[in-house]
């Protein structure tokens, strides 16, 4: 079967290429239905990655957040028409200690390997997770980002001290919003505070215990643990504030991505006995557990729906460009592509 793949060939320039798909191989053929644009996709689209990185990784199909529909499974494991969420991380080996998303041998879609902007995607059976029949597929298209937050929380749970009466989340964007939803559900007895820069964005966090602008944090405010969801240049200020307001032996989960090194007040880190926990991406088990949360707590999906900024019906290559350009100017939320091309 001939498949069309829509690749970024240079910043802001897409082209279509073709590949031959063996539908009778040991894989599942999935038709993407809804895709969601990530900040990492935008760094490629706008050319904000290092020039050597762009030269090495392009041309490449973008987007690693998507849901789709099974169109063919030669093994018969999944029925035709089954709605699934696709897992972008693809391991080539298993390790009894190291998680699949930290193995150097794993590859990740839309990061040096083609993402989900294709007519059909060839997926291994363990790289798709079936979804409930009545779920909102448009909202669930950004499940990958939910799984990233969930994975970070699980790492935090395993590595932190038992005292968990209060959490601080630095970052009022998409990742901060999702992390706040999950922390409120997984730790219902704990206080959850969100720290951000924009009143408009902070107004969406009505379900947490309190919100603060980063330049008006009370001096006496203390938290047990923190989640840094800022990224970029703001990571340094966020970490500075976290280290100042976190209690002794607290843990700091680092989720924000910065292209440049950031300074950390190691004197206070040592003095307070703090633990910094790095986290990146997620694996198939995280996706499975997130979908289980959707089933158990439908209100999670309702809150996630408020994160959707725009939904673009993509019928042509120009629609793809329009979607990425619109996403750049979006002040809040995720841009979803209804994939009808």
UniProtKB/Swiss-Prot annotation:
It catalyses: D-ribitol 5-phosphate + NADP(+) = D-ribulose 5-phosphate + NADPH + H(+). The keyword Cell membrane does not apply. Keywords: Cell wall biogenesis/degradation, Metal-binding, NADP, Oxidoreductase, Teichoic acid biosynthesis, Zinc. InterPro entries: ADH-like_C, ADH-like_N, GroES-like_sf, NAD(P)-bd_dom_sf, TarJ. The keyword Cell membrane does not apply. GO terms for molecular function: ribitol-5-phosphate 2-dehydrogenase [(NAD(P)+] activity; zinc ion binding. One of its GO terms (biological process) is cell wall organization. It is an enzyme of class 1 (oxidoreductase). Zn(2+) binds at residues 38, 64-65, 144. Its EC number is 1.1.1.405. Pathway: Cell wall biogenesis; poly(ribitol phosphate) teichoic acid biosynthesis. Its cofactor is Zn(2+). It comes from the Bacteria. Belongs to the zinc-containing alcohol dehydrogenase family. HAMAP family: TarJ. Heterodimer together with TarI. Catalyzes the NADPH dependent reduction of D-ribulose 5-phosphate to D-ribitol 5-phosphate. This is Ribulose-5-phosphate reductase 2.
């Amino acid at each position: 079967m001939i498949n069309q793949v829509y690749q970024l060939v240079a910043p802001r320039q897409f082209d279509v290429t073709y590949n031959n798909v063996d539908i009778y191989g040991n894989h599942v053929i999935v038709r993407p239905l809804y895709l969601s644009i990530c900040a990492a996709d935008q760094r490629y689209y706008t050319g904000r990655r290092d020039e050597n990185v762009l030269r090495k990784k392009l041309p490449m199909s973008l987007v690693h957040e998507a849901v789709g529909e099974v169109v063919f499974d030669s093994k018969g494991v999944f029925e035709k028409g089954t709605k699934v969420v696709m897992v972008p991380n693809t391991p080539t080996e298993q390790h009894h200690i190291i998680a699949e998303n930290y193995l150097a041998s794993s590859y990740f879609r839309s990061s040096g390997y083609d993402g989900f902007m294709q007519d059909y995607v060839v997926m291994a059976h363990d790289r798709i997770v079936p979804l409930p029949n009545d779920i909102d597929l448009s909202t669930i298209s950004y499940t990958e980002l939910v799984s990233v937050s969930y994975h970070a929380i699980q790492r935090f749970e395993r590595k932190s001290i038992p005292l968990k009466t209060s959490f601080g989340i630095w970052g009022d964007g998409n990742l901060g919003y999702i992390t706040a939803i999950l922390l409120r559900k997984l730790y219902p007895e704990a206080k959850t505070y969100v720290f951000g820069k924009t009143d408009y964005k902070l107004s969406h966090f009505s379900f947490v215990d309190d919100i603060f602008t980063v330049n008006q944090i009370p001096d006496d405010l203390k938290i047990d643990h923190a989640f840094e969801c800022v990224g970029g240049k703001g990571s340094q200020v966020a970490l500075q504030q976290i280290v100042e307001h976190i209690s002794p032996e607290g843990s700091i989960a680092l989720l924000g991505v910065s292209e440049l090194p950031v300074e950390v007040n190691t004197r206070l880190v040592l003095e307070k006995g703090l633990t910094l926990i790095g986290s990146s991406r997620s694996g198939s088990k995280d996706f499975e557990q997130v979908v289980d949360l959707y089933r158990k707590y439908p209100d999670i999906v309702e809150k996630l729906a408020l994160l959707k900024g725009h939904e673009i019906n993509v019928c042509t290559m120009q629609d793809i460009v329009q979607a990425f350009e619109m996403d750049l100017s979006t002040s809040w939320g995720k841009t979803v592509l209804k994939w009808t091309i």
